[in-house]
């Protein structure tokens, strides 16, 4: 019999809590106790993912984004933590600690682009390294293709939408940071990167990055992070071979792209 705490210990080995940012809320956030035979790995715990876990008879969901982040002042049937407890499904959420972890979100992202001689930046969260020389538009197309192949397909539209800023030079040294990392363009420049690939970047990040000679690729928050779910599932299976670990097929990008 595998317990909730055994899985939590295994997840702490995969993504040590001491790697988390001080403002974050990772950990065992919903504990329904009991034995666990099957786990669902996801990026987000949405009502659709809870329903999927229940349908697949999973007693636990392991996610990247915390199902509880801000303090709860009230809770009801429309709230996902309520839905988890009602279904008897526990939740372990590993957020910024999984971003920074060895083999975590950003190392998985770096691996997609075959980065070599990797270093960390942004307080250990991001990764920067050498890649085979490539033009920015070609790298953006590669990001769209490779990430789409690793994400759940939407019901309508393309799986991944990529925006890019071309500073006019080929990319030999790439910085990656998943999610909302556009504000870290100066950190990428300080590490000698030619391009920063992230999930989200705003209008002013794009203008400033180009002005300073850094190309920027924004490939989507979901698309840059969902690929880690397969890696987490594989690590958890290796740690607890008797545990069945599935990857969510219902956890999709919340946006629909034209």
Q: Across the structure, where does each feature detected by a protein language model lie?
A:
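Hydrophobic structural segments
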Residues: 1-258
């Amino acid at each position: 019999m595998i317990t909730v705490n055994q899985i939590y210990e295994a997840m702490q080995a995969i993504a040590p809590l001491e790697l988390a940012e001080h403002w974050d809320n990772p950990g065992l956030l919903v504990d329904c106790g009991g034995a666990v035979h099957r786990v669902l790995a996801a990026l987000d715990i949405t009502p659709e993912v809870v329903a999927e876990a229940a349908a697949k008879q999973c007693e636990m969901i392991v996610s990247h984004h915390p199902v509880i982040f801000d303090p709860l002042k009230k809770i009801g049937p429309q709230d996902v933590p309520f839905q988890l407890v009602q279904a008897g499904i526990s939740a372990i959420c590993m957020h910024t600690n999984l971003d920074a972890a060895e083999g975590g979100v950003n190392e998985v992202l770096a691996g997609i682009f075959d980065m070599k001689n990797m270093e960390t930046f942004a307080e250990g969260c991001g990764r920067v390294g050498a890649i085979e020389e490539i033009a920015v538009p070609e790298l953006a197309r590669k990001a769209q293709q490779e990430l789409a192949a690793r994400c759940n397909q939407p019901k309508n539209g393309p799986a991944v939408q990529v925006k890019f800023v071309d500073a006019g030079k080929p990319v030999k040294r790439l910085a990656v940071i998943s999610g909302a990392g556009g504000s870290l363009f100066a950190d990428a420049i300080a590490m000698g990167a030619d391009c920063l690939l992230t999930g989200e970047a705003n209008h002013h990040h794009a203008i400033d990055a180009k002005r300073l000679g850094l190309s920027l690729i924004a490939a989507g928050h979901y698309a840059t992070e969902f690929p880690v779910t397969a890696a987490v599932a594989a690590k958890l299976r290796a740690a607890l071979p008797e545990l069945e670990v599935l990857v969510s097929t219902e956890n999709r990008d919340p946006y629909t792209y034209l």
